[in-house]
Curated annotation (Swiss-Prot):
Pfam family, one: UxuA
HAMAP family recorded: UxuA
Essential cofactor(s): Fe(2+); Mn(2+)
InterPro entries found in the cross-reference section: Man_deHydtase, Xyl_isomerase-like_sf
E.C. number: 4.2.1.8
Name of the protein this chain belongs to: Mannonate dehydratase
Domain of life of the source: Bacteria
GO molecular function, one term: ferrous iron binding
Stated family: Belongs to the mannonate dehydratase family.
């Protein structure tokens, strides 16, 4: 497994020198300064590669080339944006970059309600509170039809939650949900967000699948020709929110994606923290079923709370994800590939570390502080090494 680290570019508080000291050799990044929907020029790709090479690092995975909303809704200039996406894939391949992570989540990428949830040990984690989110939908956003998505009891709890909120708390919750978390390409005001939601009024799960199928049938052949592996990231959280459909949340969704364009280049990012939020997602079975299509992994854990729709980010080796079993399944696939002549290790990155130690006194990107991810990387590295020593000595 290749040890990688997500870096948000020159403005990231975590420097390339920091990353190198953490033990990562590969960088997961994107050209965040290129507007969504525009082609990534070869010159800009090479410039970023040179910046990394100066520190002895390589650009291992693109995360992400954003999928424009016109593509997801199949409206406006979707064909132009698909053509731009195709050319960006070609340009990345020309520079030797062969793995692209992306997602097809409508409007929002990943969603949390609390970015500073204090754990018993004093460190801070990200949290999704189902009732807080209901309060946002019902009483702040006031989305039409939102009541149909919540039980009577949930609506009562949301009313009580909202009634106890101060103006500052309302502002913070709103900002956390719609202003854009790290990796998101867009943030919104409430009115902008309502307008964007209205674009999905007539798009259900079937229609969104149709739009994604159109996209895949256009870009996978280009990826095949260029030798690029596409790796779709799951929905986070992996269920419908805000009345929006979600189509990359379960093993059934993965099967649909595989069958829609049956190519090894149409693959997956195995994000254990996203898929693992659902108790009905068997992560090891997912890895084993789609092993040859897993081109990238995000290894983190979450912990479901008393309300199973509420969760927080757990320590990497604890929570609801059996990290040892997942890493074993990944190494089993890596061993199979090695025997078949594919010597490329499967890249993984430690996802969403806790904010801890002196990072508590620093400005950090939510979920992407240095020390929490350093801890996660070291822990997963230890699991990997122990498994290799005992079960996979030929991978050492």
């Amino acid at each position: 497994m290749e040890q990688t680290w997500r870096w948000y570019g020159p403005n990231d508080p975590v420097s390339l020198d920091d990353i190198r000291q953490a033990g990562a050799t590969g960088i997961v990044t994107a050209l965040h300064h290129i507007p969504n929907g525009e082609v990534w020029p070869v010159e800009e790709i090479k410039k970023r590669q040179a910046e990394l090479a100066q520190k002895g690092l390589t650009w291992s995975v693109v995360e992400s080339i954003p999928v424009h909303e016109d593509i997801k809704t199949h409206t406006g200039q979707y064909d132009r944006y698909i053509a731009s996406y195709q050319q960006s894939i070609r340009n990345l391949a020309a520079c030797g970059i062969d793995t692209v992570c992306y997602n097809f989540m409508p409007i929002l990428d990943w969603t949390r309600t609390d970015l500073e949830y204090t754990l018993p040990d004093g460190s801070k984690a990200l949290r999704f509170d189902h009732i807080a989110f209901a309060a946002f939908e019902l009483h702040i956003l006031k989305r039409d039809g939102a009541r149909h998505d919540y039980t009577d009891d949930e609506q009562r709890q949301a009313q009580d939650y909202f009634s106890a909120m101060s103006e500052a708390q309302i502002e913070t919750l709103t900002r956390n949900i719609i202003a854009g978390l790290p990796g998101a390409e867009e943030g919104y005001t409430l009115d902008q967000f309502r307008a964007r939601l209205s674009e999905y009024d007539h798009i259900d799960k079937t229609a969104l699948r149709d739009n994604m199928a159109y996209f895949l049938k256009a870009i996978v052949p280009v990826a095949e020709e260029a030798g690029v592996r596409l790796a779709v990231h799951p929905d986070d959280p992996p269920r419908p929110i805000l009345g929006l459909p979600r189509i990359v949340s379960t093993i059934e969704d993965m099967q649909w994606l595989k069958e829609t364009v049956d190519s090894i280049h149409n693959g997956f990012t195995m994000c254990t923290g996203s898929y693992g939020v659902r108790a009905d997602n068997d992560l090891v079975r997912m890895v084993e079923t789609f092993a040859d299509r897993i081109h990238f992994t995000h290894l983190r854990s979450t912990c479901r709370e008393a309300n199973p729709k509420t969760f927080h980010e757990a320590a990497h080796l604890y929570g609801d994800v059996d990290m040892v079993a997942v890493v074993k399944a990944i190494l089993t696939e890596e061993q199979r590939r090695k025997k078949a002549g594919d010597l490329r290790p499967i890249p993984f990155r430690p996802d969403h570390g806790h904010q801890m130690l002196d990072d508590l006194r620093k400005k950090t990107n939510p979920g992407y502080s240095a020390i929490g991810r350093l801890k996660g990387l070291a822990e997963v590295r230890g699991v990997e090494l122990a498994l290799k020593k005992v079960l996979f000595p030929d991978l050492l």
